[in-house]
């Protein structure tokens, strides 16, 4: 058997197969990296928007504001938030004319998978009680989100 036949019928097809497999592996890895980057960006955005909604309200619209924020929550945190807002926050805001405006100064992804993410937020909140001068507080919050039906929902909210 001649070497040209060995190369033509053995080595070249094997090399082509190896290159095809390598290209497929690289394509798969590229897709996984892109999916992770998208999940990271979406979860940070959801944590930022959700935190702003959870911590911002005006006395005349507090019920609507905080009820709307509930759509960004899930699990036991949804239950705890609902109880706290109905029992404490809404009545207090209406009686004492309390308004709050929260802004996220910085946000960073701590960890992200396809169905769960943890985001660290640095939050500034300005609170006004009646006609008193506003007070500002800064805090750090660790937000855990679950990806449910394609939506990132807050499942834990831990001040740190």
From Swiss-Prot:
Protein name stated in the entry? Outer membrane protein MT2024.1
**Cellular component annotations (GO), alphabetically ordered:** cell outer membrane
Q: Which keywords does this chain's UniProt record carry?
A: Cell outer membrane, Membrane, Signal
Indicate the secretion signal residues.
Answer: 1-22
Q: Which domain of life is it from?
A: Bacteria
Q: Give compartment(s).
A: Cell outer membrane
Q: Does the keyword Plastid apply?
A: no
